[in-house]
């Protein structure tokens, strides 16, 4: 028999590409014989195939392209997934999770057997997102740039709903894949020979013991900040005309990025551990003009950052992740004459900011807190619109994103101005405790 916990984790990782409820057999009657498993997997595929909803398209006027860029060799190389305004809307064929090792990494993160990762890659490794792979960049204007930092156990590809949404409104978004071993999986090439034959060196998530958690997480957030700055430097080098080599051998012509980025309009954005990375990197790199921290994990944030972070900062929190202690730490960033905003999305959970909220079925998504009470599309739409309004103000954009200025103030039926604890009628439950290894 398969334990109930394993079935639940299996459902989580299945990431059904359409929101479609279906019924699992009672665990006591579960048969693990290969012939029976084959028929059960067939039924799962059939259930998924009859659905209709997945990662949303951007709501802006620009077609969206996507590519991967890697500069240099070894584990200090720069690795980003780039979302950008495209010349034309080609096939929406960007693979969501492109290598089976990422599924293996997710199984490590969740503590399940590696065979689960293999099965999930077989079933869902071809799931695509609504962006055109290697489509030519739309030329003729300079774009603002957003560097994005992923959460613990995540990687560069699973924030496509945010990346695509922002790119469809005229941003270039570079999602960094971190090499601090906070990603479920990542890879690099040791040298040019390895890159030529695609001999990848894989790094998997580091399991951190409780007694070493504080020191390790603070080291990781510092490395993550350096990696965000390093990614920014590499992209700006290309913008200045430096002919860098993409060691991935992509068909995307990087020369298109020359003179395509307005380096006075650069922001930093991140989710959870990536939100903590936003706070760290802003304090160290003034090229980032402002930051958006999505439900930041405050555990690794050093107190010295409170007064060192000078740029405007927007916190967008979920309703059920933060503790009063976490909110108190965020409010210590409220310094005199410094722009600080905080809003909370009602009925949301921590995973409402990443793609898993869209690609998991309704029943499983709600049971495993991948979905909140709020519709996932409404939550991500509020996130993107509030972010764009904030970015327009502080990057000096000549757009119409100011129509969403009320969202930055929490003026919407689905928003709370300030923290979850500022709503008299809402008492949020805690998903995790500070310092937990399941934080994201």
From Swiss-Prot:
Annotated GO CC locations: high-density lipoprotein particle; low-density lipoprotein particle
Cite the InterPro entries for this sequence.
AB_hydrolase_fold, PAF_acetylhydro_eukaryote
GO MF terms here are:
1-alkyl-2-acetylglycerophosphocholine esterase activity; calcium-independent phospholipase A2 activity; phospholipid binding
What residue range is the signal peptide?
1-21
Keywords from the UniProt entry = Glycoprotein, HDL, Hydrolase, Lipid degradation, Lipid metabolism, Phospholipid degradation, Phospholipid metabolism, Secreted, Signal
Describe the inactivation phenotype.
Mutant mice show increased susceptibility to neonatal necrotizing enterocolitis in response to formula feeding, bacterial colonization, and asphyxia/ cold stress.
Report the catalytic activity: a 1-O-alkyl-2-acetyl-sn-glycero-3-phosphocholine + H2O = a 1-O-alkyl-sn-glycero-3-phosphocholine + acetate + H(+); 1-O-decyl-2-acetyl-sn-glycero-3-phosphocholine + H2O = 1-O-decyl-sn-glycero-3-phosphocholine + acetate + H(+); 1-O-dodecyl-2-acetyl-sn-glycero-3-phosphocholine + H2O = 1-O-dodecyl-sn-glycero-3-phosphocholine + acetate + H(+); 1-O-tetradecyl-2-acetyl-sn-glycero-3-phosphocholine + H2O = 1-O-tetradecyl-sn-glycero-3-phosphocholine + acetate + H(+)
Q: How is it modified after translation?
A: N-glycosylated.
**Keyword Protein biosynthesis, does the record have it?**
no
**Where do the catalytic residues lie?**
272 (nucleophile), 295 (charge relay system), 350 (charge relay system)
What's a single GO BP term from this record? low-density lipoprotein particle remodeling
The listed locations are: Secreted, Extracellular space
Annotated glycosylation sites: 59, 75, 199
- Please describe the organ and tissue distribution of this protein's expression: Plasma.
One of the Pfam families matching this protein, by short name = PAF-AH_p_II
The protein's matches in SUPFAM superfamilies, at most eight in alphabetical order, are given as: alpha/beta-Hydrolases
Q: What Gene3D superfamilies has UniProt attached to this entry? A: alpha/beta hydrolase (3.40.50.1820)
Enzyme Commission number, as recorded: 3.1.1.47
- Belongs to which family? Belongs to the AB hydrolase superfamily. Lipase family.
Describe the task this protein carries out: Lipoprotein-associated calcium-independent phospholipase A2 involved in phospholipid catabolism during inflammatory and oxidative stress response. At the lipid-aqueous interface, hydrolyzes the ester bond of fatty acyl group attached at sn-2 position of phospholipids (phospholipase A2 activity). Specifically targets phospholipids with a short-chain fatty acyl group at sn-2 position. Can hydrolyze phospholipids with long fatty acyl chains, only if they carry oxidized functional groups.
Name this protein carries in UniProt: Platelet-activating factor acetylhydrolase
């Amino acid at each position: 028999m398969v334990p109930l916990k394993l079935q639940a984790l299996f459902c989580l990782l299945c990431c059904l590409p359409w929101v479609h409820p279906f019924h699992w057999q009672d665990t006591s009657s579960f048969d693990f014989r290969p012939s029976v498993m084959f028929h059960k997997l067939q039924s799962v595929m059939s259930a998924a195939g009859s659905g209709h909803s997945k990662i949303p398209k951007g709501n802006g006027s620009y077609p969206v392209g996507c590519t991967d860029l890697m500069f240099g060799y070894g584990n200090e190389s720069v690795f980003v997934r780039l979302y950008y305004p495209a010349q034309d809307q080609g096939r929406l064929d960007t693979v969501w999770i492109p290598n089976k090792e990422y599924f293996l990494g997710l199984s490590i993160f969740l503590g399940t057997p590696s065979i689960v990762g293999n099965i999930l890659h077989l079933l869902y490794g071809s799931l695509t997102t609504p962006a055109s792979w290697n489509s030519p960049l739309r030329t003729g204007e300079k774009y603002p740039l957003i560097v994005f930092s992923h959460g613990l156990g995540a990687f560069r590809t699973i924030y496509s709903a945010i990346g695509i949404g922002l790119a469809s409104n005229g941003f270039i978004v570079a999602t960094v894949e971190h090499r601090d071993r906070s990603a479920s999986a990542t890879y690099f090439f040791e040298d040019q020979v390895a890159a030529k034959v695609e001999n990848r060196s894989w790094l998997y998530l580091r399991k951190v013991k409780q007694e070493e958690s504080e020191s390790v997480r603070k080291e990781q957030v510092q490395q993550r900040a350096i990696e965000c700055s390093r990614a920014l430097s590499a992209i700006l080098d290309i913008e200045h005309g430096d002919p860098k080599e993409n060691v991935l051998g992509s068909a995307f012509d990087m020369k298109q990025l020359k003179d395509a980025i307005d380096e006075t309009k650069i922001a930093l954005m991140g989710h959870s551990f990536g939100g903590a990375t936003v706070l760290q990197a802003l304090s160290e790199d003034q090229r980032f003009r402002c930051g958006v921290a999505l439900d930041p994990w405050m555990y690794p944030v050093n107190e010295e950052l409170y007064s060192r972070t000078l740029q405007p900062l927007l916190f967008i929190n979920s309703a059920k992740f933060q503790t009063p202690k976490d909110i108190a730490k965020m409010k210590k960033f409220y310094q005199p004459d410094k722009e600080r905003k905080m809003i909370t999305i009602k009925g949301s959970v921590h995973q409402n900011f990443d793609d898993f909220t869209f690609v998991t079925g309704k029943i499983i998504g709600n049971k495993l807190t991948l979905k909140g009470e709020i519709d996932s599309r409404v939550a991500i739409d509020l996130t993107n619109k509030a972010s764009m309004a904030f970015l327009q103000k502080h990057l000096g954009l000549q757009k119409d994103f100011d129509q969403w200025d009320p969202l930055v103030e929490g003026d919407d039926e689905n928003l709370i101005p300030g923290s979850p604890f500022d709503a008299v009628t809402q008492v949020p439950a805690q998903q995790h405790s500070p310092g937990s290894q399941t934080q994201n």
